[in-house]
A protein has these predicted regions:
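OB-fold ssDNA-binding interfaces and closely related basic DNA-contact patches used
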Residues: 1-94
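Acidic, gly/ser/pro-rich intrinsically disordered tails
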Residues: 1-6, 156-170
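Hydrophobic residues positioned within well-ordered beta-strands of beta-sheet architectures
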Residues: 33-35, 127, 147
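Beta-strand elements of well-folded, non-transmembrane domains
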Residues: 39-41, 131-133, 153
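Beta-strand/loop nucleic-acid-binding surfaces
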Residues: 96-114
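Short, flexible loop/turn elements at secondary-structure junctions
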Residues: 99, 131-133, 148-150
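Exposed beta-sheet edge/beta-hairpin loop segments within beta-rich domains
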Residues: 108-125, 132-142
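OB-fold/S1-family single-stranded nucleic acid-binding modules
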Residues: 136-156
Length: 170
C-alpha cells in the first residue's frame, strides 16, 4: 500500500479556491475540491517541510513505480515567477491540492466557516495537505491531496471579483 506524508503549511495565500463545491478540472472530468497554495519564497520552513515530505514519499513508494524513482517525475513545488504571469505569484512557489472529499474549512479560532463568501481566492491561511505517489495512465508523480484549510486573515480578492460591500462602501 502506498504511503503518504502529511504537511501543515505556514501562512499561504489561497488561489483558485473551490473548497465548498467541487469542480471538474476538465469538462466531463471527476468533481474535486481544490485550491492553489501560494507560498512565499521567504517561508523557508514551509518550503523545507514540503520538500522533505515529497522526498519521503518518493523513497517510501518506489514500488509504485516499479522499484525505482523515475526520472522526470511530476509533482512538487512550482515556481510562480517562472510559470505564472500573475503578480499574486511573484516571489512565490505554488502547489495545487485537491480531493474528492470535502475539506474542513475553519477560521483562526477553529470555528467552521459556513458562509461561502468568507473563504475566497486571495485570503490567507494555513492548509493541511498529504503528498502521495501515483502511477496512472502512464503518468507518474507525487500528488498533493487537500485535507483541510484554515483562514487566518483577509486579503485582496484574486481574479477581479469584489463583494457588494467593497463596491459600495463610502
Amino acid at each position: 500500500m502506498a504511503k503518504s506524508a502529511k504537511v501543515v503549511t505556514g501562512k499561504v495565500r489561497f488561489s483558485y479556491a473551490h473548497v465548498f463545491e467541487p469542480q471538474a478540472v476538465q469538462e466531463g472530468g471527476a468533481l474535486k475540491y481544490s485550491v492553489s497554495l501560494i507560498i512565499s519564497k521567504n517561508d523557508k520552513e514551509t518550503i523545507d517541510r514540503i520538500n522533505k515530505a515529497i522526498e519521503q514519499v518518493k523513497e517510501d513508494n518506489k514500488s509504485v513505480w516499479g522499484g525505482s524513482i523515475p526520472k522526470g517525475l511530476k509533482g512538487g513545488l512550482r515556481d510562480g515567477d517562472a510559470e505564472k504571469d500573475d503578480p499574486a505569484y511573484k516571489n512565490s512557489y505554488f502547489i495545487n491540492a485537491n480531493s474528492a472529499q470535502k475539506p474542513g474549512v475553519v477560521d483562526a479560532d477553529l470555528n467552521p466557516i459556513i458562509d461561502k463568501t468568507e473563504f475566497y481566492s486571495g485570503c490567507f491561511g494555513r492548509a493541511s495537505v498529504s503528498f502521495f505517489a501515483y502511477n496512472s495512465n502512464g503518468s507518474k508523480g507525487v500528488g498533493c491531496g487537500l485535507n483541510n484549510v484554515q483562514k487566518l486573515e483577509e486579503g485582496d480578492r484574486l481574479g477581479g471579483v469584489t463583494t457588494a460591500t467593497e463596491d459600495f462602501a463610502v
